[in-house]
A protein has these predicted regions:
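Catalytic core of pol beta-like nucleotidyltransferases
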Residues: 1-86, 90-101, 111-287
Length: 287
């Protein structure tokens, strides 16, 4: 974590100084001259980081490119399920990195009021997959098409949103980003990667199942699945305090987020630790 050398254009996407790209590049070079940054092979990184991370990054980038056809294939498969409205790529692959520890993570926008039916069908399908294929089918985040604004507005969420790669149906992705313009206060110069996006029409079976459940029975079933999922997770993770449970297993009518081991908190805490360490070792205040 935080050992990923960056190209100047990637750093520029995260800057909030309101300066031109040329001026920003010159600022980076000045920091290198003052030994506040290191530079090698066109990558910038902390002066306290290992140069070997460049080799690791390059290999991960090659792996990511090779994995994209697989991600698109599984994204299409997810979209075939009832009540899925759009599918985007998240996780490390959305950031152009993939290694032996990586999964393929998906961010799914669902029809309003049917998120939990949608998720349950996808989880049942996931359980039927081989161990190898399960790592290509990680649906960790579901959100209702009518409630798209993220509740948590922090650097972690901003990064995840701004690096989403829309795979199936760009309209759903565009609507998501329209409801989360706050992301620009963290990452304001990054354009989404749209080169993998395709528009797919729902199939006959998908339409039929959706029509069959577009009634009070569907409402009751969705509410039932929400209730049972929360009960199951509370039994499985009784050690979690209410606040931690809410953060790791956000389960509401219009959203489902499942991130075990407190990953978001760990990332944000490590970011602050590294920031403080850099300030101490260089004498430069970052905030």
């Amino acid at each position: 974590m935080f050992e990923y050398p960056l190209r100047p254009e990637e750093l520029y996407a995260h800057q909030g100084l309101g300066i031109s790209e040329d001026a920003f590049h010159q600022m980076l070079e000045d920091m290198v001259d003052k030994k506040l940054l290191s530079k090698k092979e066109g990558f910038y990184f902390s002066p306290f980081a290992r140069h070997e991370n460049i080799v690791r990054r390059k290999k991960g980038n090659v792996n990511a490119l090779e994995m994209m056809p697989t991600a698109i294939k599984w994204g299409k498969r997810i979209f075939r399920f009832p009540f899925v409205r759009s599918v985007s790529l998240s996780g490390s692959l959305s950031k152009n990195y993939f290694d032996e520890h990586s999964d393929i993570d998906f961010f799914v926008v669902t029809k309003s009021g049917r998120l939990w039916i949608c998720r349950t069908l996808l989880i049942l399908y996931w359980k039927s997959l081989s161990l190898k294929n399960k790592k290509y089918f990680c649906t960790n985040y579901f959100i209702d098409e009518t409630v798209l604004e993220m509740e948590e507005k922090n650097h972690f969420t901003a990064t995840e949103l701004s690096y989403l790669v829309p795979l199936i149906n760009a309209a759903g992705f565009n609507n998501l980003m329209t409801h989360n313009t706050w992301v620009k206060s963290y990452i304001n110069n990054r354009a989404p990667v749209l080169s993998y996006t395709i528009n797919v029409q729902p199939g006959i079976v998908k339409k039929a199942i959706e029509a069959l459940l577009q009634n009070p029975i569907g409402d009751m079933l969705d509410n039932f699945l929400l209730k049972k999922t929360i009960e199951r997770w509370r039994r499985k993770y009784p050690e979690l305090a209410a606040e931690d449970f809410e953060l790791q297993f956000r389960s509401r009518k219009n959203v489902c987020k499942r991130h075990t081991k407190g990953f978001q908190n760990k990332v944000l805490q490590q970011l602050e630790t590294l920031r403080a360490d850099y300030e101490t070792r260089t004498g430069v205040k970052l905030s």
